[in-house]
């Protein structure tokens, strides 16, 4: 009888340890994806910050807000006599295969056409770049993130703009979705 009780107590303890280990593995993976989301949000904020205030990419010319965090928005923006087609979203793929680290991001060429630039870093130090017109098919290890951003005029006070970037992992390899949002205020 005592042996049976000891086996039951031991079994419960081992099952508890297995559940704990599973949760630790999932939490560790989710932390990795949150960290990558934070890096991509920060990268986009820095990218948008480099434009002059009157550039169509960051100008809010009609209404109080440009862009959307809930859907992909493209707008025709005129500022300082220049009219540009501006996307308030992009896609970034990160992949590690064969020792190479690749990042593919979407953008527009001089004619306003969407293209995808892939930059690959090899272990030898070689860096290659390629541009294609369609998003490359993801491999099994590819993480695909979607970034959307808004630019708010006179928020939180007059004379400044608040830029908010939302990064979402679109092919989650973990059960819980991964979203990361970051904002900055600039004149």
Give the label of every model feature segment.
Residues 1-43, 51:
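Aliphatic-rich helix starts adjacent to a transmembrane/signal segment
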Residues 35, 39-187:
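Low-complexity, Gly/Pro-rich coil/beta segments used as flexible assembly/activation regions
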């Amino acid at each position: 009888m005592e042996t049976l009780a000891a086996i039951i107590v031991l079994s419960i303890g081992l099952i508890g340890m297995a559940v704990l280990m599973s949760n630790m593995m999932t939490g560790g993976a989710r932390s990795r994806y949150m960290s990558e989301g934070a890096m991509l949000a920060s990268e986009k904020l820095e990218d948008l910050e480099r434009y002059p205030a009157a550039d169509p990419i960051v100008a809010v010319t009609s209404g109080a807000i440009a862009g959307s965090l809930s859907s992909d928005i493209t707008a025709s923006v005129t500022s300082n006599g220049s009219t540009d087609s501006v996307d308030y979203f992009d896609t970034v793929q990160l992949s590690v295969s064969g020792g190479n680290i690749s990042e593919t991001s979407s953008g527009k060429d001089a004619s306003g056409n969407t293209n995808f630039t892939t930059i690959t870093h090899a272990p030898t130090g070689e860096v290659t770049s390629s541009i294609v017109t369609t998003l490359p098919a993801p491999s099994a290890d590819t993480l695909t993130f979607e970034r959307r951003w808004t630019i708010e005029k006179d928020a939180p006070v007059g004379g400044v703009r608040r830029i908010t970037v939302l990064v979402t992992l679109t092919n989650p390899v973990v059960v819980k979705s991964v979203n990361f949002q970051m904002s900055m205020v600039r004149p």
